[in-house]
């Protein structure tokens, strides 16, 4: 079986019973279950949700995105072998640890297959909750160009690239385009301050002002849980993005939860500790791939300048990447996943067929 056969690149065409359009994101696709199937599974599986709660299947792919584009390899290798399973395994590990530490629940109710989560529909907080422990990446580029204020926080003069910050900084941005919020630009992924969020807490989908404190606590405590665990593996947790939302439990109580993914190579920067002590940055996340792209193409501004998106999309579409590059990414993702979970990653020889069989035979979601 070829490498391409082991990759799940298209994940929005599964014959799962649904009465709504499939939502296809950059990496995951979401299938909303029918009310009948949701109610049946809640009863059969004993999920801690209201009897009429809407459920969904979240199916991950092996696609690789960077700079808002999907990148593909030569010879039909349209994803990274092992990437989807690695991301799900890492997130599931951290979500479980958060719950054990008494932080908060996640949206995951069940894991039928390494590529599949059954999730409870959540009302999302419209914030990309970003926490930073080092000045690097986009923050460093802006700082180098003279910016000193980030999300209402003023940084001191004299910081160096990749320097550890005195404390964890929370630098949130908008999740999607928010309209009608005074002082908040109507654009996706723009930085916002704590004052912006307090002033428009309902516009950001918070139930009450006190939940702003709660999300910041969950962000910092979750960051520290992951950072401590990675430190024991001699890995450095540099920065990350969390997402939050609201769900109800079986008794009808609303709770703020972690959602999407946490602490993965897609949503975080992770550095190798031994290399850092030697003065080198060795990425154990997607950042290594981003840097490869910036170094590979003669005009990296195309990848950084949001005013050149048509050129960027054309660049990604017109350049199939070498197999060795795709396999380097695979080794990074699978390697850090196995470090984190402490055992070999469960890999699929034919993920699509496996998913169909388990959802048909064990969950009754495919006719």
Swiss-Prot record:
Q: What is its EC number?
A: 6.3.2.6
A single Gene Ontology biological process assigned to it is:
'de novo' IMP biosynthetic process
Query: An example Gene Ontology cellular component term from the record?
Result: cytoplasm
Top-level enzyme category: ligase
Q: Which reaction does it catalyse?
A: 5-amino-1-(5-phospho-D-ribosyl)imidazole-4-carboxylate + L-aspartate + ATP = (2S)-2-[5-amino-1-(5-phospho-beta-D-ribosyl)imidazole-4-carboxamido]succinate + ADP + phosphate + 2 H(+)
The UniProt entry, under CDD domains, shows: SAICAR_synt_Sc
The record's listing under InterPro entries reads: SAICAR_synt/ADE2_N (IPR028923), SAICAR_synthase_Vibrio-typ (IPR014106)
What keywords are assigned to this protein? ATP-binding, Ligase, Nucleotide-binding, Purine biosynthesis
The family database entries (SUPFAM superfamilies) matched by this protein are listed as: SAICAR synthase-like
Pathway of action = Purine metabolism; IMP biosynthesis via de novo pathway; 5-amino-1-(5-phospho-D-ribosyl)imidazole-4-carboxamide from 5-amino-1-(5-phospho-D-ribosyl)imidazole-4-carboxylate: step 1/2
Q: Which Pfam families match?
A: SAICAR_synt
Q: Which GO-annotated molecular functions does the record name?
A: ATP binding; phosphoribosylaminoimidazolesuccinocarboxamide synthase activity
The entry's family comment says:
Belongs to the SAICAR synthetase family.
Read off the HAMAP family from this record.
Answer: SAICAR_synth
Q: What is this protein called?
A: Phosphoribosylaminoimidazole-succinocarboxamide synthase
What is this protein's gene name?
purC
């Amino acid at each position: 079986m070829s490498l391409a056969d082991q990759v799940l690149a298209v994940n929005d065409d599964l014959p799962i019973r649904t009465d709504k359009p499939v939502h296809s994101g950059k990496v995951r696709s979401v299938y909303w279950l029918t009310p009948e199937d949701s109610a049946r599974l809640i009863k059969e599986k004993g999920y801690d949700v209201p009897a009429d709660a809407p459920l969904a299947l979240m199916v991950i792919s092996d696609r690789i995105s960077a700079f808002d584009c999907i990148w593909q390899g030569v010879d039909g290798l349209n994803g990274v072998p092992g990437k989807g399973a690695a991301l799900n395994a890492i997130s599931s590990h951290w979500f479980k640890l958060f719950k054990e530490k008494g932080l908060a629940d996640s949206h995951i109710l069940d894991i039928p297959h390494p590529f599949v989560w059954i999730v409870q529909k959540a009302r999302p907080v419209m914030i990309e909750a970003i926490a930073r422990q080092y000045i690097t990446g986009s923050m460093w580029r802006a700082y180098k160009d003279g910016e000193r204020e980030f999300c209402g926080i003023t940084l001191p003069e004299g910081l160096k690239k990749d320097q550890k910050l005195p404390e964890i900084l929370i630098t949130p941005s908008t999740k999607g385009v928010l309209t009608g919020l005074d002082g908040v630009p109507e654009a996706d992924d723009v930085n916002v301050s704590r004052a912006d969020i307090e002033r428009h807490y309902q516009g950001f989908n918070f139930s009450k002002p006190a939940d702003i404190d709660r999300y910041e606590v969950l962000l910092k405590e979750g960051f520290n849980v992951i950072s401590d665990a990675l430190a024991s593996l001699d890995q450095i947790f540099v920065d990350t993005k969390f997402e939050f939302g609201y769900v109800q439990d079986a008794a009808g109580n609303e709770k703020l939860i972690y959602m999407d993914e946490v602490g993965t190579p897609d949503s975080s920067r992770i550095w190798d500790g031994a290399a850092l002590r030697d003065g080198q940055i060795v990425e154990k996340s997607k950042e290594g791939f981003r840097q490869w792209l910036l170094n590979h193409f003669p005009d990296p501004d195309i990848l950084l300048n949001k005013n050149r998106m048509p050129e960027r999309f054309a660049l990604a579409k017109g350049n199939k990447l070498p197999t060795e590059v795709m396999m380097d990414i695979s080794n990074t993702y699978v390697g850090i996943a196995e470090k984190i979970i402490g055992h070999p990653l469960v890999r699929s020889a034919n993920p699509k067929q496996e998913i169909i069989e388990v959802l048909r035979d064990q969950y009754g979601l495919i006719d």
